[in-house]
Structure formats: C-alpha cells, structure tokens
Amino acid sequence: MPKVIAHIAASASFFALVLLLSVPHAWGQTSAGSVSAVNGTVSVERAGKSTPAADGTAVQVGDKFTTGPNSRLTIKLSDGSQLELNESSTLVLTQDTLNPDGSRANTKVTLLGGLVRSLVHFNPAGAPNFEVHTPNAVASARGTMFDVSYHEGQPPPANP
C-alpha cells in the first residue's frame, strides 16, 4: 500500500509540473521591459521596498514608479512601446501579458498622480490592448501616442 501511495504522489507531482510548464509564456514572464532613462530623483517600489530607479532596471508587474520635482522617467516595454513619466508623478504597472509570439497582448498601468505619455507600438498582426487607468477614468489605445494626466482635487483641463 505505501508503494501505491508513493507512486500516486510521484505521478501527481509530475502532472503538476507538466501543467505549470504548459501555461502560456505570458504567465512566466518576469520582465515587462526596462528603465531606459532616468533624470533626477526617481524611485521604484517593489514588494513594499523602495529603491532608486536606474537605467537598465528591470520593470515587473506591480512595480510602482514615483518621480520627484524636475525629474523624468522613461520605461521601454518589451514590445518597443514606451512610457514617459513626467515630474511629480506616480505610476503602477498593473498588467502586462504577451502573445505566444512575444507581441503585446494586454498592458494596463495605473496613474495615481501626475502625467504619463504613452507611445504604444503598433502590431499589424493584432493590435494590443493598452490602457492607462486613473482614479476617475480609463484611456485605451492601439498603436498611437497619447498623454494622460491626473491631479487629485483639480478639475480636468478644458479642451481647446
């Protein structure tokens, strides 16, 4: 009887490993891109620990970036899209998934304050879903450049 239980446990472990390895590449993705430029004071908070951001820093889902006054940050995502965070801004990368061919499937960021410029890479094989969330709105784009700003307690700017 103990040999049967050991055999069942070994088989279950093997099938669990096969299942984990068969999950699409996007699940196992460890880096969504990297920091390509830092000007001034910029921090990245990961797993509750804040450190200064530097050129080449890997960007992961859940990372929270904060720029100080007169500071800027540029993040290059793995598909070539770019995020440019303006001074006194805070941004969280909340989702980043890729298609099996490595093209972007879904990216979501949350702008908690300040301004972000998004340069979204166009993929002719299938446009990615790229969203910028703020506490009161969502902007979505596929293959374009756009700015989103959010300043708590301030009315949105008037359209010209």
Predicted segments, located by residue:
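Bacterial N-terminal signal peptides
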Residues: 10-22
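Intrinsic disorder/low-complexity signal
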Residues: 8-11, 62
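N-terminal secretory signal peptides that target proteins for export/translocation
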Residues: 1-7
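Flexible, surface-exposed loop/linker segments and immediately adjacent secondary-structure boundaries
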Residues: 28-160
